Amino acid sequence: GYKSIHHVDLELRPINILIGSNGVGKTNFISFFRLINIIYEQRLHNYTMQNSAERLFHYGRKQTKELKGYLEFGDNAYGVTLQARDNGSLFIAEERSYYQSRPIVVSNLDESYIKGSTTFRDKWLREYLQSYKIFHFHDTSKGAPLRSSANINDNRFLKTDGSNLPAFLYMLQEKHPKTLKRIELTIRSVMPYFGNFSLAPSLLDESQINLQWSDMENNEKYFDANDLSDGSIRFIALATL
């Protein structure tokens, strides 16, 4: 069991909506995928210094002796079993990679072996495990990362807080313009007043870029991220994601 979740077996689709009252485990379910990414990135030891087994195990160590996770995608799967040391930190009792239900098992690890493995099976798994990120666009206050300028070269992927949104969109504009046009079309379906992005390096500092955009009826007036409502800028980030 993990936190408030004793056991769950759930088939996930490309888009999934979790509905439930407060405290039923929606946030904990999502945070499990962050834990999987932490394990893959070999940061389990540091993570459990702040998050001991007593906090992560369902009703603590007295009730739960180990935490198990199993993720299946097509012919491949990944499994991990975590157990607690006497000091409350966690170690990997078993880590398993599967192909067509046939596992390779490695036991008693401080950190995951998958990231450094050279086998073809584990290389394929890495593409999944390293992609497990939790994107959180809740902070839309003035001066929030989502509304701030970004380093124009910080564009390899969209960050989990959206802090490099203008740089990532600019990269799409320059390298994948059709993708950017689809994003703009999606935004207009929810925000009819939205015209287009006006993305370019700052004339005063070419290493920086702001989220500039034009209005459908007046493309000469200056608008940036601070002119968007909280819901609008969150939707732009989600459409980009």
Q: Where do the PLM segments sit?
A:
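Conserved RecA-like P-loop NTPase ATPase core
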Residues: 1, 36, 80, 228, ...
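Phosphate-binding glycine-rich loops of NTP-binding sites
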Residues: 14-51, 95-97, 161, 235-241
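Short, mixed charged/polar active-site loops
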Residues: 7, 75-79, 220-222
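Pre-Walker A adenine-sensing motif
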Residues: 2-9
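Electropositive, glycine-dotted interaction segments
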Residues: 68, 72-199
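Conserved ABC ATPase signature
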Residues: 185-241
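Conserved functional loop/turn residues at catalytic and ligand-binding sites
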Residues: 1, 14, 22, 227, ...
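Conserved P-loop NTP-binding catalytic core
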Residues: 30-90
